[in-house]
Amino acid sequence: MKENSCTACSRRLALFVGAAVLVVGCSSKTDVTLNRDKPLVFFNRQPSDPLTGKVDMAAMNWNDKTYYVGFDAKFGGSIQGKMILDFLASSESSVDRNGDGIIGYVLCIGDVGHNDSKVRTEGIRRALGTWTGSSDPGQAKEGQAVVGGKSYKVVELEGKAMTGTDGSTWNTNSATESMGSWVAKFADKIDLVISNNDGMAMGCLQASNYPRGLPIFGYDANADAVESVGKGELTGTVSQNVDAQAVAVLQIIRNLLDGSSGEDVVANGISRPDAHGNKISAPVQYWEDVKAIMADNSEVTSANWKEYTRGARDAGVRQVSAPTKKVLLTVHNASNDFLASAYLPALKHYAPLLNVDLTVVQGDGQNELSCLDKFTNLDMFDAFAVNMVKTNSGADYTDKLKY
């Protein structure tokens, strides 16, 4: 065979005892897609600088098939803040438990380096007038709110990042322990408990000395949290429309693998019907500057909690007839309440409808290698969906996709 007679050949050298065998297989260049050219969708944790929150555009511009799917976190923080203000405005003076004219609150912070945690804390503090320009613990000033037509001072008694003994953030056990300490320290000075997510809020409720009826607000609309709202235990939470996010992750991949380009990638089946008539029902937006699909948020209270109960899926997404594609998906923490109880079940519900064969690998929530070490056999997959442990780890994944 002449050297140039099979320019698209791949050559692999197999060594055997006492012999070397040259294996030559010919295939068309168009038959092979390099990993670096495959769709890559980051989700739930936007590639970004953990200190400044600036989006990591090097990761987002890895290739022209790289996108992020999340939710409008800043708007969500505002929704949570407004929900708390509305609650106070409609409350009686007895919400001030010790009658000192001050609404005191404690704050469970998820992760000081996480964009979602930052903007949720900002939304809360802006609404209550305690915002100083920083989302860090201890950085709050005296604010003001109206309770039953009367103005009250608002004080953040303490804000704390809930980090577990294993280093994991957004930690439920840490929230339980902290709540117990807060009750012992502040007693009836605590008028509200506010949390960056439902997992920590539910952890607070598990404290043995949690004051019965003390108002508490979470975020995520996890199934157990929504049920808790219905029981009158949790005062309110915020839905980030996880079904819309899960469908968007899969739909973008489906669009790219089906050959869509340009606006069709981020619109078909998302903001307008695709060829199968599918379209996400909840409001979503495309932020072109950061290549992100963002779902809207909504508050969940005693007035509407039944609309968010488990099992309500998007009727706008139905079975498609497209070829099955294989996708490797990472989850940063197998123990994360939101991902385990809401996001993954949604992904697993919609993936078969879009003929996406998901392989899910899960990490421990603290060490990126717990995901990266399972981010293997990449040639077997048509696309990748990545939920990182740390928001600045985008390059760790794209480095593995170079070839």
Swiss-Prot record:
Chief location: membrane
Annotated TM spans: none
GO molecular function: carbohydrate binding
Keyword field: Cell membrane, Lipoprotein, Membrane, Palmitate, Signal, Sugar transport, Transport
InterPro entries, per the entry: Bact_Solute-Bind_Prot2, MglB-2_Peripla_BP, Peripla_BP_I, SBP_2_dom
Lipid sites, type S-diacylglycerol cysteine: 26
Similarity field: Belongs to the bacterial solute-binding protein 2 family.
Name of the protein in its database record: Glucose/galactose-binding lipoprotein
